[in-house]
C-alpha cells in the first residue's frame, strides 16, 4: 500500500509513511481512516521521503475541496511533513495551500527526528 499509517490514541499521534506512487485515491483512503477513527485532531507525522506524487491539477482541486470541508467541520492537529526531494516539496506545499484557513500548525522538515521533536512540543 502506498500510504501506511498508525493511529495511536494514547499518544494522540498519527504516523504516516508514503512510499512509491501515491494517487488521489490513496490520499482519500488515508483521510477517511482519520475521520472514522476520530484522529483528525491528533498530531500527524507524514514521512514523504520515499513518495512519488501522482496527481493532476483536477485531482488536486478535488483533494482541496475535501480538505476545505474538513477544515470547516473538524479540528485538525499539528502536521509535520518530512520531505527531502524538490518534486515532493512542491506537492506538499500545494497540499498545504489547499488547507489555508486551518488554524493548526504545519511545518516541513528534512528528517523524521526533527519532525518528531517539533510534534512532541505541540499541544493537542
Show where each model-derived region lies.
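Amphipathic, Lys/Arg-enriched alpha-helical "gate/interface" segment within cytosolic domains
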Residues: 1-124
Amino acid at each position: 500500500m502506498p500510504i501506511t499509517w498508525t493511529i495511536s490514541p494514547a499518544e494522540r499521534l498519527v504516523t504516516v509513511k508514503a512510499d512509491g506512487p501515491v494517487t488521489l485515491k490513496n490520499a482519500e483512503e488515508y483521510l477517511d481512516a482519520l475521520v472514522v477513527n476520530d484522529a483528525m485532531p491528533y498530531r500527524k507525522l507524514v514521512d514523504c521521503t520515499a513518495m512519488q506524487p501522482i496527481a493532476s491539477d483536477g485531482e488536486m482541486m478535488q483533494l482541496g475541496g475535501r480538505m476545505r470541508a474538513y477544515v470547516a467541520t473538524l479540528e485538525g492537529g499539528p502536521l509535520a511533513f518530512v520531505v527531502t526531494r524538490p518534486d515532493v516539496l512542491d506537492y506538499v506545499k500545494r497540499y498545504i495551500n489547499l488547507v489555508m484557513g486551518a488554524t493548526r500548525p504545519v511545518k516541513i522538515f528534512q528528517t523524521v527526528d526533527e519532525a518528531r521533536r517539533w510534534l512532541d512540543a505541540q499541544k493537542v
